[in-house]
C-alpha cells in the first residue's frame, strides 16, 4: 500500500482521511531521519548522504536553518569541493591515504576561515579561506557547523560496543541532541515520542536474549525490523 500512498492522498485531498498498513518508518519522518543519522555516523560521510539528511525539514529546522540556507550550504559544499570523509584521520582509519583534501573538516575550515578574514588571497594557518561568505550567512554557517560536529561526535561514541541498557540511554541522548524538544512542532514531538518508545522496547527485547556488549550494526538490524512493521492491519483507508 505504501507505493500507492501519494496517489491516494492526491485523490482524497479534500476528504479527511488516513492511510493504514504503512510501516512506522514511512509514516514517521522524524524516525526515518533518525535512522539515517545513525547509519550515517558509521559510514564514509559522503557529501550527498550528509546533505540528503540535512535537507530533511525535520533535521534542518532543528539547527535554525531554512530551505534557503540549505540551498546555500549545498552550494558551499560544491564550491569547497567536499567529497567524503570526516578528516585525514578518518581516511586513515578506513585504511586509505591520510589526506585532508576534500574532507568535511577541510571544507569547514575553509568556510570558517573565509567568514573570519573575508579574503582568499593567501593561506592562513595552512587554510585557504573561502571568501564568498557574507555576514548574513552566519546563521547558515553556524547551523552547518553544529550539524557536522554532532555527526562527528556521534560517529565516535556510536562506534563502541554497549549493552542494551547503555544503548537505549545513548540513543535517547542523541535523539534529543538531534531533535531538541524546544524547537520542534507538536507533530514532530509526537513523532519523537514514538522514537523514545521504540528505543525503550529495544532495551527490553535485546536483554531477553543477549546481555553482552553489542555493536551498532546489531542495533540497526533490530531497528530496521521494528520500523518495517505496519502501524495497522485493519484496512487500507480509514476515515478520521
Residue spans of the language-model regions?
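Polyanion-engaging groove/track-forming segments
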Residues: 1-240
